[in-house]
Amino acid sequence: MDAVEAHDREAWLALFADDGVVEDPIGPSAFDPEGKGHRGPEAIAAFYDNVVAANESIKFTIRESYLCGDECANVGVIRITFAGGSAMEVDGVYTYRRSPDGKIAALRAYWEADNIRSVS
């Protein structure tokens, strides 16, 4: 999350394996209408440009973290501040699977649009 919070696109993209996938959120959404995820460097870069970089700031507060082998699950809340200052939060579970070379093979986000709340 450091790279996201710092708006460091190249550092964030470098975290992913060449065949990595981002599913944020899991299933069909405004970010991924077909629900297939953003797979590979170009698709992950487009996700960053269209979703991450489009926001003023993104802060993830981890409440609990579970590590098992090459996988990790973080439970917490993500707060997104939009250009202009309005903000929203949503609780979720974010899972990560590491590839053999230590990069992120899969980032999967479990959150529901119905649970998004406006904050000030």
Q: Model-found features: residue ranges?
A:
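Short, aromatic-enriched amphipathic alpha-helices that serve as compact interaction elements
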Residues: 1-8, 15
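Short basic coil micro-motifs at the edges of alpha-helical modules that engage polyanionic partners
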Residues: 1, 35-36, 87
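A beta-strand edge to alpha-helix "cap/lid" segment located at domain peripheries
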Residues: 45, 49-120
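A solvent-exposed, acidic/Ser-Thr-rich amphipathic alpha-helical stretch
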Residues: 10, 17-69
